[in-house]
Swiss-Prot record:
Name of encoding gene: rpmH
The protein's name: Large ribosomal subunit protein bL34
Organism superkingdom: Bacteria
One CC-aspect GO term: ribonucleoprotein complex
MF-aspect GO terms: structural constituent of ribosome
One Pfam family here: Ribosomal_L34
InterPro entries listed in its UniProt record: Ribosomal_bL34, Ribosomal_bL34_CS
Stated family: Belongs to the bacterial ribosomal protein bL34 family.
UniProt record, GO biological process: translation
Key words of the record: Ribonucleoprotein, Ribosomal protein
């Protein structure tokens, strides 16, 4: 049986990376929410 999680750095960065987050309004909201909460890591 194939496992469901097959990690790929490029895919991860394109979907969850900082620049991907900053590209959309909701993504920026996510970053701001994590900043307000005081997260050490804002994105992957």
């Amino acid at each position: 049986m194939k496992r469901t999680f097959q990690p790929t750095v490029l895919k991860r960065k394109r979907t969850h990376g900082f620049r991907a987050r900053m590209a959309t309004k909701n993504g920026r909201a996510t970053i701001n929410a994590r900043r307000a909460k005081g997260r050490k890591r804002l994105s992957k």
